[in-house]
């Protein structure tokens, strides 16, 4: 078998490996000395460990006891001499040793980075079939000792991956449903379920860790699965894009994944760009995910949700991780707000969180509008809706246009949980090719490159957060925070230039739509109580003054035709200039330099001096033609000659024979 597997050469062309973050489960461990210690799962696809409540790294020693990690100058990271204990149970010697030798999670950054190397994920979507309807192979594999436990495994996974409106396992959609929804129908993959394939060795052979280094025989596991699938008759060429390249093969393995369990010999779910050669073509990448998830609240193993697969498949499509890949616990990243962070685990992974606006544009599934430096009223429709939209606010101090803020609208829907609240989500992005390529987007606590600006000013990690903490992230949300500037709390805090020099105000939410004023102190109120009154022998249009208004724009319409526009400084206008419009409509708009214009207030009335629109002409008559203000333009025009008059005008016609007064609107006879 070993010789056979070697035929499926694993080529290391720009090899990268990216994975799901550890599900930060707490376990209560009994130690050999009779004590118990509470630990939290940590690590990634390369390194697996546990963390104490005060962030010291712990792994198992050869006898199965949990010990603190220290860094030996010869062996590197290894187990120390002390068993791990909760803070209050530590001896004096143990505390002294920890202060000198103990390794905190943030301190393994160098080792984790060395193992990751350059990840190869892209600064933009990789062009890996983000459009169209590709056929994706999914090979079901089990070990010699760990078999699939779900009933009707092939049929179950056929529905899990492909069923429309899938509700199995407590979900709200299949894997295909998820990507069809995020792409708004632009990407509609079909997953070809293959297997079950039984591997030659037991699970621990493929998934065992070397110290705290993960899955020492994973490549062999994938190559063996591919070889056995091909030997059983699978033609990989049907998955090719036409040039002999098979973009990806997916593996679902029996049992749990190490990232979401305490099974240290289980395989950690991950995506890799390692290349595998088959008779049917060259496989460019693979991803592996697990069958089962341990539901601790009900103490049962159940079919894992689609979240982990959707996360890993999103790596295949080009997205990096937005969690801290070095496992520092003081970095928020995007937490539950993104599937590329902890959002893959929402509802135990059964209902993963939908794509952010950034992720949708990254794929080419959404175009985000850029707000220029002019005041305006903006409306943001919900992500996932037919009319979804989002906005950029650029940092003009950055000539590369790499730093910006994204404003998107989160509303409860299939892929956006009600528990997280609703409103405007503001993200701060500082793109760096190196950070994206190395999969280190949010590894620097002082310079997170993809995170949110919370309305309540508090970023609370998922293992400590209450629902109100997430609801408090949104504007106006439960905090009723309606503005954001360089001087508010929270404030725009760009990394370049010190200040942004832009601001938004009057953030509101109504019927699922978020509105705000950009580069304005607010929106002026609509003028009220419009009326036509007699004043000093003249007809006057009047209205209540609007607070903060500096001028008013009055538009006069004849039907749908704009007759004239007049700016006034007071809350009234003389109507003698209306002329001969019979049924004028007035629209009044309040204006001010630092505010968005008010909505238009409207009133209509019948002008006793006006004339009716012409309804037809007498071919034997001639007309004198006047402007609406009464200026004579020409005399003795026959009816058919009136067609030569310029459009977009209103003319008064006086008949030579009947001396009647009529008019033409926009050069068209009504």
Language-model features: locations:
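Conserved aromatic anchor
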Residues: 537-548
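Sec-dependent N-terminal signal peptides
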Residues: 4-13
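Non-catalytic C-terminal accessory/binding modules of secreted extracellular proteins
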Residues: 166-181, 185-186, 193, 219, ...
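Short S/T/G- and acidic-enriched coil/turn segments that sit immediately N-terminal to beta-strands
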Residues: 568-574
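N-terminal prosegments of processed precursors
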Residues: 18-126
């Amino acid at each position: 078998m070993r010789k056979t597997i070697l035929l499926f050469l694993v080529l290391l062309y720009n090899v990268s490996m990216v994975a799901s973050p550890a599900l930060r489960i707490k376990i209560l461990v009994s130690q050999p000395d009779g004590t118990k210690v509470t630990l939290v799962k940590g690590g990634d696809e390369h390194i697996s460990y546990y963390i104490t409540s005060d962030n010291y790294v712990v792994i198992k020693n050869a006898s199965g006891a949990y010990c603190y990690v220290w860094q030996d100058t010869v062996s590197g990271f290894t187990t120390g001499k002390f068993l791990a204990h909760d803070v209050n149970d530590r001896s004096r010697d143990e505390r002294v040793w920890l202060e000198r030798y103990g390794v905190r999670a943030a301190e393994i950054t160098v080792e984790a980075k060395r193992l990751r190397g350059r990840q190869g994920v892209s600064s933009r979507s990789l062009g890996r079939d983000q459009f169209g309807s590709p056929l994706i192979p999914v090979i079901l594999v089990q070990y010699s000792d760990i078999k699939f436990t779900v009933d009707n495994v092939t049929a179950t996974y056929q529905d899990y991956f492909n069923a429309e409106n899938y509700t199995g396992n407590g979900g709200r959609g299949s894997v295909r449903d998820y990507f069809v929804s995020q792409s708004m129908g632009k990407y509609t993959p079909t997953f070809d379920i293959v297997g079950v394939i039984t591997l030659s060795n037991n699970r621990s052979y493929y998934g065992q860790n070397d110290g705290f280094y993960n899955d020492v025989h994973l490549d062999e596991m994938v190559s063996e699965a591919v070889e056995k699938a091909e030997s059983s008759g699978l033609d990989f060429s049907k998955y090719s894009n036409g040039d002999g390249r098979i973009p990806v093969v997916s593996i679902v393995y029996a049992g749990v994944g190490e990232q979401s369990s305490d099974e240290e010999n289980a395989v950690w779910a991950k995506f890799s760009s390692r290349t595998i050669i088959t008779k049917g073509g060259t496989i460019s990448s693979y991803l592996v995910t697990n069958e089962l998830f341990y539901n601790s609240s009900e103490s049962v193993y159940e079919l894992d949700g689609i979240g982990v697969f959707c996360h890993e498949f999103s790596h295949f499509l080009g997205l990096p991780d937005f969690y801290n890949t070095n496992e520092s616990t003081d970095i928020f990243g995007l937490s539950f707000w993104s599937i590329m962070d902890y959002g893959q685990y929402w509802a135990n992974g059964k209902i993963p969180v939908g794509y952010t606006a950034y992720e949708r544009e990254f794929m080419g599934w959404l175009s985000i509008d850029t707000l220029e430096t002019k005041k305006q009223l903006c409306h943001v429709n919900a992500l996932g809706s037919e009319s979804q939209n989002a906005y950029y606010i650029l940092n003009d101090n950055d000539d590369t246009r790499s730093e910006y803020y994204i404003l998107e609208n989160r509303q409860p829907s299939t892929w956006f949980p009600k528990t997280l609240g609703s409103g405007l989500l503001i993200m701060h992005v500082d793109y760096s090719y190196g950070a994206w390529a190395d999969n280190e987007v949010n590894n620097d606590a002082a310079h997170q490159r993809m995170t949110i600006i919370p309305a309540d000013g508090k970023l609370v990690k998922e293992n400590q957060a209450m629902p109100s903490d997430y609801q408090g992230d949104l504007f106006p949300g439960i905090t009723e925070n309606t503005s954001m500037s360089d001087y508010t709390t929270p404030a725009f805090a760009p990394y370049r230039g010190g200040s942004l020099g832009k601001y938004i105000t009057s953030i509101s939410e109504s019927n699922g739509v978020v509105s705000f004023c950009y580069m304005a102190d607010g929106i002026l109120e609509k003028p009220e109580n419009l009326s036509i009154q007699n004043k000093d022998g003249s007809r006057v249009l009047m209205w209540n003054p609007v607070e903060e208004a500096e001028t008013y724009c009055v538009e006069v319409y004849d039907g749908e035709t704009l007759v004239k526009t007049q700016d006034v400084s007071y809350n009234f206008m003389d109507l003698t200039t209306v002329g001969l419009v019979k049924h004028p409509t007035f629209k009044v708009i309040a204006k001010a330099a630092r505010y968005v214009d008010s909505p238009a207030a409207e009133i209509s009335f019948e002008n006793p001096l006006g004339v009716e629109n012409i309804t037809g002409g007498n071919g034997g008559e001639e007309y004198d033609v006047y402007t609406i203000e009464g200026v004579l333009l020409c005399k003795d025009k026959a009816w058919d000659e009136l067609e030569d008059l310029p459009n977009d005008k209103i003319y008064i016609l006086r008949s030579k024979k009947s001396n009647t007064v009529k008019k033409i609107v926009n050069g068209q006879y009504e």
